[in-house]
């Protein structure tokens, strides 16, 4: 079940209080900064259809070309977003194997992005992948998370994996496995954030100015 609306997160909380919160134990969500398409309920995340649902941080540069291809294949689009294009492309290539589908889509899309993906056929799993946009996997006790940065999860866990380029994480309630695009499992070091909550918001730096200075090379890239 999808619940979304434009504006502040409080608007979504109010909407769910009025309509009833979805029942379940796996979910994805995203606070969207509008790049393709105006801020609106329909352009808000998640996007997808009955088989695939995604959230997306970043920009898909060749979304127009991919959208034209998908329209030619009979797909229609409700939003103006590049995210919906990625969702429909996943649906187009989906053959029952999420890993193969994600790898194929990664070979097609260009840009910098982080994706959180759910497949209807795999209701207990979240798939996550990144290219040039940050993405971490938080490891908790009988709960796991994906987020763009540590401050989003530090109230729930301090343990996390840093995903590298084109690595695919498969997240379940009690397990996290990470693979390359060829399906080979990767064993990564588990990191632990030893900062307090205030420091976490500064990324481990003493103050925000230092954080911004050290982030400038990545911003320029």
Where in the sequence are the language-model features?
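Conserved short alpha-helical segments that host acidic/polar catalytic motifs at enzyme active sites
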Residues: 1-221
């Amino acid at each position: 079940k999808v619940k979304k609306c434009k504006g502040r997160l409080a608007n979504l909380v109010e909407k769910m209080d009025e309509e009833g919160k979805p029942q379940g134990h796996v979910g994805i969500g995203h606070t969207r900064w509008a790049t393709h398409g105006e801020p609106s309920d329909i352009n808000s995340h998640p996007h997808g259809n009955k088989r695939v649902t995604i959230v997306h941080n970043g920009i898909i540069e060749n979304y127009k070309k991919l959208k034209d291809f998908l329209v030619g294949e009979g797909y229609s689009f409700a939003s103006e977003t590049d995210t919906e294009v990625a969702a429909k492309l996943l649906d187009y290539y989906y053959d029952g194997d999420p890993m193969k589908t994600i790898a194929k889509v990664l070979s097609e899309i260009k840009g910098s992005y982080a994706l959180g993906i759910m497949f209807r056929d795999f209701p207990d799993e979240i798939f996550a992948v990144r290219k040039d946009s940050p993405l971490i996997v938080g490891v908790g006790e009988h709960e796991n998370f994906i987020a763009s940065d540590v401050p989003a999860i530090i109230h729930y866990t301090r343990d996390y994996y840093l995903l590298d380029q084109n690595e695919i994480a498969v997240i379940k309630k009690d397990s996290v496995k990470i693979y390359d695009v060829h399906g080979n499992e990767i064993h990564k070091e588990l990191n632990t954030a030893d900062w307090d909550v205030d420091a976490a918001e500064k990324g481990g730096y003493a103050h925000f100015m230092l954080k911004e200075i050290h982030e400038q090379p990545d911003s320029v890239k």
